[in-house]
Design a protein with these regions (language model features):
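Helix-to-loop junction immediately C-terminal to a conserved catalytic motif
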Residues: 56
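Short coil-to-helix segment of the ABC ATPase nucleotide-binding domain corresponding to the Q-loop/switch region
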Residues: 102-110
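Catalytic Walker B motif of ABC-type/P-loop ATPase nucleotide-binding domains
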Residues: 167-170
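Hydrophobic anchor residue at the start of the ABC signature
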Residues: 156
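A short, proline-enriched helix->beta-strand linker immediately N-terminal to the Walker B motif
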Residues: 161-165
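Conserved ABC transporter NBD signature motif
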Residues: 64-72
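Conserved ABC ATPase signature
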Residues: 142-146, 150
């Protein structure tokens, strides 16, 4: 399989050399294969949020390299980096990050508009992804008029409309009720298995993580443990994840 993301010996140190320093990441290496659904877990302060920020190119490592689609993103700067991020990386955040003065349809279209795509093509692409996520009936609605679960589906559509190399989820179910969370996770799993969308999910929630094929557990800035689902039922994988999380906290 093709490696679409390669992280090699990434470290991140906060603070100047003459001040008190904090090492958030300490030599992390792993890769993501095309079509993989991978989870990142760890307690608060473990380094998982720092890793996500570096993966999403919103922060730079102190040392090490990150390759996405065979491009070393640590060498990109300014507009070049912004263009790469817009085309190659999709984001789903916990708090949706929708623009309240735009309809669902307009929110989904934003990344394509920024890339200068023609309006006719934008409309086609927006309707295609909206159909895929079962939200065509709310395309003319504003965020204030739709539910949390629907908002997150709009956010997912916006993230996927550019057909990015990888979809990054930062606690995407965190603001949802249990039914909406399950619906979103079922959709993400379907996008992964049927459309081969590559997904990296950062979460503290064992139920969300049980949808992944492989999970990296981060502790003290290093990969403490890795576990694969290997054909287990989701219930069995969920129990295994809970056990590992319990051991991590000891």
């Amino acid at each position: 399989m093709d490696k679409i993301v390669e992280i090699n010996q990434v470290t991140k140190i906060y603070g100047k050399s003459n001040e008190k320093q904090t090492q958030a990441l300490n030599g992390i290496s792993f890769s993501v294969e095309k079509g993989e659904f991978i989870g990142i877990m760890g307690a608060s302060g473990s380094g998982k949020s720092t890793l996500l920020n570096i993966l999403s190119t919103l922060d730079k490592p102190t040392s090490g390299t990150i390759q996405i689609n065979q491009e070393d993103v640590t060498k990109l700067k300014g507009n070049q980096l912004a263009d790469f991020r817009a085309k190659e990386i999709g984001f789903i955040f916990q708090d949706f990050n929708l623009l309240e003065n735009l309809t669902a349809q307009e929110n989904i279209a934003v990344p394509l508009s920024l890339q200068g795509v023609k309006p006719k093509i934008i409309k086609q692409k927006v309707h295609q992804i909206a159909e895929r996520l079962s939200i065509t009936h709310i395309l003319d609605s504003y965020p204030a008029k739709i539910s949390g679960g629907q908002k997150q589906r709009v956010a997912a559509a916006r993230a996927l409309v550019t057909q990015p190399t990888i979809l990054l989820g930062d606690e995407p179910t965190g603001a949802l009720d249990s039914k909406s969370a399950k619906d979103l996770l079922d959709t993400m799993e379907e996008l992964n298995t049927k459309d081969h969308v590559s997904i990296l999910l950062v979460t503290h929630d064992a139920f969300s993580a049980s949808y992944c094929q492989r999970i990296l557990f981060i502790k003290d800035g290093v990969i403490h443990q890795e576990v694969k689902r290997n054909g287990q039922s989701r219930e069995a994988f969920y129990r295994e994840i809970l056990t590992i999380l319990g051991n991590l906290e000891q």
